Amino acid sequence: MSETIFHKIIRREIPATIEFESETLIVIRDINPQAPFHCLIIPKKTIRSIHEVTPDDAGLLLEMVQAAKALAIAHGFDQDGYRLVMNCEEWGGQTVFQLHMHMLAGAKLSGGFA
């Protein structure tokens, strides 16, 4: 798999606004936010997309969701709600080919799914 901008952010080769970091994840602010609060929850393990996740990655996916929950509580979005999105490959809207989850919050979001 080719290197992405996220790999460079993880290695601190390019700047980013970091909201949270652990041994296995980094959470950064999106540089083109689609909501008042828009972060990207990125595993440090190289995984191209959700399609390439294996059963061994189940704990990592849980950690991503738990990071979103902790951010929601820390920023006061836990009561009003927030959106978590993963795009998969080009037709699914993925533009950076490293697994990541978008967290959008801070306003009532339109275009929701039932």
Q: Residue locations for each model-derived region?
A:
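HIT superfamily nucleotide-processing domains
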Residues: M1-A114
